[in-house]
Amino acid sequence: MAEQLEVVIITGMSGAGKTVAVQSFEDLGYFVIDNMIPSVATKFVDAVKQSGEITRMAMVMDSRSRGFYDQVVPCVAQLRGRSDLTLRLLFLEATDEELVSRYKESRRAHPLSHQDGVLPGIMRERQLLNDLKSQADLVVDTTTLTPRQLKQRITERFSPDEAHSFYVNVMSFGFKYGLPLDADLVIDVRFLPNPYYIPDLKYQTGNDPAVQAYVMDNPLAQNFYQHLYSLIEVALPGYIKEGKSSLTIAIGCTGGQHRSVTIANRLAADLKNNQYPVHVHHRDVDKAN
């Protein structure tokens, strides 16, 4: 019996990192097609299957293709309905501010920008992609990710060895810098005592043992964390049963330096000890206090 074809559709906001994604999938051994027209994707997949030489392929579909916005959602539905392949949809995004900055740096025009500039084009594209984003198997916010970090995220989720495993992404962040766009669960730990106001701890972070001890030795933090971990421990099997391929848990404090980093590190360590594949990302830990 022929091996089932694995298909990944790479899509999302223009400027959010699809070029890096293409390189990442190529390095993983996927057969990659950039700028696939949705209306011909099904026929192309049929041709790939008939060749019998390819078992993993990735296709980039985005606003460069004529008719993309009208055709992509029906295309995804058609491919998902097939029993002879598995389909996963990767959606890349970033904040408006970050996308504007990237376009200014590259000096390229946004595909939906007219004479009114880059930002209105980004806003139009985001609205047009809402339905597609809701169907994604994995949404990755690349706002604070370097190309290397994005490649690592893709490798951890789409390498052949990890293709069918559930994956937990634990991240810390600072509320003052905005909510993470790709979080499934957001946990607010701003009620915990803040090491920022302790002179010896102010310029350390939740990656340092002294800060971790200050936060976790507090009875309130201990009680809270026990309840938090119990909640996550109960919820994860349910997410897996529902077919969710990943879960992003975002832990937030004021600046993303101390409390959120400490709790995120502790949660990630305990989940790893419980045999869950876990990636930890401290979004704002390197920002100045």
Swiss-Prot record:
SUPFAM superfamilies: P-loop containing nucleoside triphosphate hydrolases (SSF52540). It comes from the Bacteria. One of its GO terms (molecular function) is ATP binding. Keywords: ATP-binding, GTP-binding, Nucleotide-binding. The keyword Nucleotide-binding applies. ATP binds at G12, M13, S14, G15, A16, G17, K18, T19. It holds the Pfam family PapZ_C. GTP binds at D62, S63, R64, S65. Belongs to the RapZ-like family. Displays ATPase and GTPase activities. HAMAP family: RapZ_like. This is Nucleotide-binding protein LAF_0356.
